[in-house]
Structures are given as structure tokens and as C-alpha cells.
């Protein structure tokens, strides 16, 4: 939406644009492919659209976690590096929250929890006290090898200058170093220089 907003301003179609986006992974529905015309006699299947529509590589027909494993193989990224980066991200977020870095940009949302109304104003995904050593104990989330339901693919692209690692072909993506499943929303006002001056 930010790109489209900027294009609108550059093209002269608008002077001020409110750009926004939402993510509601927890409410992603299950799809029943046979539901429209009937399953007839026998069992049917429910498909998790969070995975099939949001986390699925439509070109290669496998989970995006497998894509991450493939990229790690190609670029020689180790499990240790992935865990260190993930822990660093969590630590920076924790420090920013404690320092109130983004409080002025956060709009609290009232949420009904049972009979009470709770003001939701702190991102619930970050975890305090995360260390690379701690998350290194987690098992990989995506099986590898010929028995894997998400087999790795053979790449014709091999970047030069990348060092082979002992982790190649091993499980590296875990619940701790992968993207989280969460909800959120953000909005931003873009304006031309003339509009700002007005």
C-alpha cells in the first residue's frame, strides 16, 4: 500500500494518502473444497488456508519453511547464524519495549476477554530473555531427506564465493527462528512536499 500510495502522489493523482495493512492469521479459515457441490458418500478434507493460502510456495508447491531451508543451503547460512539473528531480533524488541520507543506510534485497542475489557497495547509475540543458546536446543520444524513431505529442490542457481557449511541438508528452521503466527495492523500517512507545507 505504501508503494501504491507513493505512486499516486508521484503521478499527481493524490496529495495525501493513508496507507494501511492488516494481518489476521489467527482468524484464517479452514476451506472445504467439496463443500460447494457436496462430498457425496465418504470423508472429506478441510484445508488450513493460513498454510495453503499464506505460507505455501505456489510455484514449487511446498511450505515456505522449506523455501527458507533451501535459501540457507544456497547461501551457506548456518543454524547458529539463524539462531543468533533471531535472538538478537527478540532482544532488540524487548529493549525497545522497555524503553517505550514506539509508544507514541501505537494505538491501544480495547479487547473483550470474558467479561472484562482489556486494553491491548503491547505486542504479544516478543518473548523476554531469549538467547541464542536457549533456542539452539529446539528441533527443526521441517523434515529433510527423501522421506520429507516437503522435499528440497535442485537449484540451478549457485552463488559464487559462498562457503559450504556443515549444516547443508540439515534442519535449521525452528519455531524460534522463523516468522511468528500473529495478528496486527499498521497505517501511515504519505504526503507530497506541497501538501506538507500547507
Briefly describe each language-model feature range.
Residues 1, 60-64, 180-186:
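Catalytic-loop motifs flanking and including active-site residues across diverse enzymes
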Residues 1-23, 66, 72-101, 187-197:
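Active-site-proximal alpha-helical scaffold in enzymes
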Residues 6, 16-71:
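Flexible glycine-/small-residue-enriched beta->alpha junction loops
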Residues 52-54, 78, 177:
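A short, structure-level motif marking secondary-structure boundaries and short turns
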Residues 53, 69, 73, 169-175:
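Flexible glycine/proline-enriched surface loops and loop-helix/loop-strand junctions
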Residues 81-197:
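N-terminal extracellular/periplasmic Venus flytrap/periplasmic-binding protein-like
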Amino acid at each position: 500500500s505504501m508503494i501504491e500510495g507513493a505512486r499516486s502522489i508521484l503521478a499527481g493523482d493524490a496529495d495525501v494518502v493513508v496507507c494501511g495493512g492488516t494481518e489476521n492469521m489467527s482468524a484464517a479459515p479452514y476451506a472445504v473444497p467439496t463443500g460447494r457441490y457436496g462430498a457425496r458418500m465418504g470423508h472429506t478434507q478441510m484445508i488450513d488456508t493460513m498454510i495453503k493460502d499464506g505460507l505455501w510456495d505456489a510455484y514449487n508447491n511446498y511450505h515456505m519453511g522449506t523455501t527458507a531451508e533451501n535459501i540457507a543451503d544456497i547461501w551457506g547460512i548456518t543454524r547458529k547464524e539463524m539462531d543468533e539473528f533471531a535472538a538478537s531480533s527478540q532482544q532488540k524488541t524487548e529493549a525497545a519495549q522497555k524503553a517505550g520507543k514506539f509508544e507514541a506510534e501505537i494505538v491501544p485497542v480495547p479487547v473483550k476477554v470474558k467479561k472484562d475489557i482489556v486494553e491491548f497495547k503491547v505486542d504479544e509475540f516478543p518473548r523476554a530473555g531469549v538467547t541464542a543458546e536457549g533456542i539452539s536446543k529446539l528441533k527443526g520444524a521441517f523434515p529433510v531427506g527423501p522421506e520429507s513431505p516437503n522435499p528440497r529442490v535442485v537449484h540451478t542457481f549457485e552463488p559464487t564465493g559462498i562457503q559450504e557449511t556443515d549444516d547443508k541438508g540439515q534442519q535449521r528452521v525452528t519455531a524460534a527462528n522463523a516468522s511468528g503466527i500473529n495478528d496486527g495492523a499498521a497505517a501511515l500517512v504519505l504526503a507530497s512536499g506541497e501538501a506538507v507545507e500547507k
